[in-house]
């Protein structure tokens, strides 16, 4: 194959003419598409950077809020634990007080029953003493005088 100088010059001229035609009709459109695509890519990269920074800020904020929530939860648990312990202590205190009241009431009731029993025993002792003494003396002293004598005797003896 023989390549001559006029062929090379013709090829270069054809290329320049083709380049001028392409530049005249399509170069602005191609440049606009490339520029718009380039600006889209730059905008997306900037948006991605902004979103990444925002995500990091939100992550830090959420971690801080989570830490605060944990602290508040712990505080609330401690507060309710303290309240529960106070309620427990109040219940135990009330139970002891109630037990003391019941014991005191029972002691008073026992003393009252003891006094009633002593009174009944005294009354029966007086009756028995009157009966025994009237049988042994075979004479009748008036009943009131006899009771008085027996009560004096019992009080001296200590029944």
Swiss-Prot record:
The lineage of its organism: Bacteria, Bacillati, Bacillota, Clostridia, Eubacteriales. It comes from Clostridium botulinum (strain Loch Maree / Type A3). HAMAP family: ATP_synth_b_bprime (MF_01398). The chain crosses the membrane at residues 2-22. Belongs to the ATPase B chain family. F-type ATPases have 2 components, F(1) - the catalytic core - and F(0) - the membrane proton channel. F(1) has five subunits: alpha(3), beta(3), gamma(1), delta(1), epsilon(1). F(0) has three main subunits: a(1), b(2) and c(10-14). The alpha and beta chains form an alternating ring which encloses part of the gamma chain. F(1) is attached to F(0) by a central stalk formed by the gamma and epsilon chains, while a peripheral stalk is formed by the delta and b chains. Disulfide bonds: none annotated. NCBIfam families: ATP_synt_b (TIGR01144), PRK13461.1 (NF009992). Its main location: membrane. GO terms for molecular function: proton-transporting ATP synthase activity, rotational mechanism; proton-transporting ATPase activity, rotational mechanism. Keywords: ATP synthesis, Cell membrane, CF(0), Hydrogen ion transport, Ion transport, Membrane, Transmembrane, Transmembrane helix, Transport. This is ATP synthase subunit b. InterPro entries: ATP_synth_B-like_membr_sf, ATP_synth_b/b'su_bac/chlpt, ATP_synth_F0_bsu_bac, ATP_synthase_B_chain. It holds the Pfam family ATP-synt_B. It is a single-pass membrane protein. It is found in: Cell membrane. One of its GO terms (cellular component) is plasma membrane. F(1)F(0) ATP synthase produces ATP from ADP in the presence of a proton or sodium gradient. F-type ATPases consist of two structural domains, F(1) containing the extramembraneous catalytic core and F(0) containing the membrane proton channel, linked together by a central stalk and a peripheral stalk. During catalysis, ATP synthesis in the catalytic domain of F(1) is coupled via a rotary mechanism of the central stalk subunits to proton translocation. Component of the F(0) channel, it forms part of the peripheral stalk, linking F(1) to F(0).
């Amino acid at each position: 194959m023989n390549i001559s100088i006029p062929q090379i010059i013709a090829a270069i001229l054809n290329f320049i003419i083709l380049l001028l035609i392409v530049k005249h009709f399509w170069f602005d459109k191609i440049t606009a598409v490339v520029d718009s695509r380039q600006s889209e890519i730059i905008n997306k990269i900037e948006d991605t950077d902004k979103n990444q920074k925002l995500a990091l800020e939100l992550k830090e904020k959420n971690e801080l809020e989570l830490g605060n929530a944990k602290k508040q939860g712990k505080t609330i648990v401690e507060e309710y634990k303290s309240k529960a312990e106070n309620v427990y202590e109040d219940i135990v205190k009330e139970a002891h007080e109630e037990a003391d009241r019941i014991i005191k009431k029972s002691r008073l009731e026992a003393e009252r029953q003891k006094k009633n029993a002593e009174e009944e025993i005294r009354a029966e002792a007086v009756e028995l003493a009157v009966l025994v003494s009237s049988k042994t003396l075979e004479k009748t002293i008036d009943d009131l005088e006899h009771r008085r004598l027996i009560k004096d005797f019992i009080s001296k003896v200590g029944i």
